[in-house]
Amino acid sequence: MDPDDAPPIRRSGFVAVIGRTNVGKSSLVNALAGERATIVSRHPNTTRRSVRVISRVGDAELVLVDTPGIAAAHDELSARLRRWVDDEWDGADRALLVVDAERGVGARERELASRLKPSDVAVVARIDRVRRARTLAVLAELAQVPLAEYFVASVRTGEGIEELRSYLASSLPEGPALYEAGVALDLPRATYVAEVVREEFLHHLRDELPQALACQVESWSDDGVEVVVYVERPSQRAIVLGHEGRVLAAVRRQAQRRLRAYPPLTLRVKVQRDWRRSARMLDELGL
């Protein structure tokens, strides 16, 4: 629908999407928004910053806040991620707790559920991976927490996605649009480019060093965008480069394909020892 033809916004608000690490929050946000807005991989803690995805649903402006997964803090980075989640959660109109149907309700889910308000919502996700009886058992355990509504959903099959989207939109408070028409992602362009590059590395490197890698745009002009890829050890630099630079080249090609509206990319790998424990480095990276 052309933004000029859309009905005026009558409801608007923020929904903080929360859950433990690696339960499919980012995939769910993308499905609810109807587009690939946040980075997704099978690695825990793929999301390292809160990403606001704006979706128009009828006369409602639904802002989905994809938050980092909740895990025990073991370095400065993970401690900061936890504080970000708390801040986004406190500032949202609603919270949506995501529970993996395979994992079920564990200690982490019970901890998060204890903080939910009666107006919040829970969803059992990835239901395509388990039998229906398992889904119902997880749902029954969640229902012990008094919430506004409970859902089941599968990003792969699409089951439950439209129902959840419609409910979240209808539950928003009355209010005007929070963003200009056509804005789909509240994220600086340099941050978006760095996140796309990082996602491509996650896909290429699989289990080798996902948590030790960070990306940052160092310079931007009409002639090109330079992205610095940080690792913590010289041995990791060799992995990121690949034999004869093939991994780095493949990542650059794939990222450029997704970012074809942007200037040409240049990737440079730099060793920054223990950057996840350095407050100064995390500040520089905007984390």
Swiss-Prot record:
Subcellular location as annotated: Cytoplasm; Cell membrane
GO molecular function: GTP binding; GTPase activity; ribosomal small subunit binding; small ribosomal subunit rRNA binding
Name of a matching Pfam family: MMR_HSR1
Cross-referenced InterPro entries: G_ERA_dom, GTP-bd, GTPase_Era-like, KH_dom-like_a/b, KH_dom_type_2, KH_sf_prok-type, P-loop_NTPase, Small_GTP-bd
Ranges of residues in domain KH type-2: 205-273
GO biological process, one term: ribosomal small subunit assembly
Domain Era-type G: 11-174
Lineage: superkingdom: Bacteria
Key words, A-Z: Cell membrane, Cytoplasm, GTP-binding, Membrane, Nucleotide-binding, Ribosome biogenesis, RNA-binding, rRNA-binding
Topology in the lipid bilayer: Peripheral membrane protein
Complex formation: Monomer.
Functional summary from the UniProt entry: An essential GTPase that binds both GDP and GTP, with rapid nucleotide exchange. Plays a role in 16S rRNA processing and 30S ribosomal subunit biogenesis and possibly also in cell cycle regulation and energy metabolism.
Family to which this protein belongs: Belongs to the TRAFAC class TrmE-Era-EngA-EngB-Septin-like GTPase superfamily. Era GTPase family.
Record-given protein name: GTPase Era
